A protein has these predicted regions:
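Helix-coil modules at protein/domain termini and other flexible surface or pore-lining loops
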Residues: 1-148
Length: 148
């Protein structure tokens, strides 16, 4: 898991998982790992939506994915995250989840997009990881606010 976090470029943050609602005016920027432009310092809070699947049995696979839809005009949207032992299952779960979420909202979100990754366990444990980063936040303000 730590190796996957390092590969993604988020290992030195305290990850705070969010539910999957993309705020209005958000811009999704897709990048290959590692993420190079995350502002913040060692130990800062990092708000994320994350999918992870770990396996430690030889000849098994770990798959993780995040799917999203986003209104082009407002920037608001939805993320979903799924994990499993096959790419097909993860992609299917992402599609079904987003279709269900879109059916309950009166918004034209456009096409489903997704990022899915997989790792094969040969001998050592592996972790498939996909991370959507919102923003980082220092602890300094939080600590000083709590002391006053």
């Amino acid at each position: 898991f730590d190796s996957a976090l390092n590969h993604a470029g988020v290992a030195n943050f305290n990850l705070i998982r969010l539910s999957s609602v993309i705020p209005p005016k958000s811009k999704i920027i897709y990048t290959n790992p590692p993420i190079k432009k995350i502002e913040g310092n060692w130990g800062d809070k990092l708000f994320v939506v994350m999918a992870e699947q770990r396996v430690d049995t030889p000849n098994t696979e770990a798959w993780a994915g995040i799917g999203w839809v986003q209104d082009k005009n407002t920037g608001k949207g939805l993320f979903v995250e799924h994990e499993g032992n096959s790419e097909k299952k993860v992609r299917s779960d992402i599609t079904q989840s987003l279709e269900a979420l879109m059916a309950t909202r009166n918004v034209n979100f456009g096409e489903i997009q997704m990022k899915v990754v997989g790792r094969s366990c040969k001998h050592e444990p592996v972790c498939a990881l996909v991370v959507a980063v919102y923003q980082s936040q220092s602890w300094e303000k939080s600590i000083s606010e709590n002391l006053n």
